Amino acid sequence: YQFMKEKNPSLEVVLEKDTKFGKAKKFDDIESKDIISLAINHNDPLCMKVVEKFTENYGTETGNLALKTLPYGGIYLIGGVTSGIQKYMKNDPKFIDAFTNKGRLVEFMRNFQVFIVDSSIEVGLLGAEEKARREMIKHSCGH
């Protein structure tokens, strides 16, 4: 946010002013959810620029990871920021364009599906539960 603010001084900064969208926030009090909310609702040009650039970088790095790991079963994105910008990611081609933009490997990149995991699913707890279940089975069989 601060970087984009310094690089784009002409962009209106709504988040740091009292508006109909809320009270002004000091830089130290700004959270990612504030930036995402104002960006998704097109209420703050700077926040929109931040989310746009983040989404592009996210797509680039996700694509780089795909080339390293070759995830033919798909890539599963999860987390608070991902769930916050999922509508933006689905409606704007920046993520997928950055993901697939790998020179002569563009067509190859289309082999990998990208999924956004619903943030309401407790993935960590489900994983811990599965691990505990496997350990119980292993120990009950005398291994």
Positions of the model-derived regions?
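ATP-binding/phosphotransfer module of carbohydrate and carboxylate kinases, centering on a glycine-rich
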Residues: 1-143
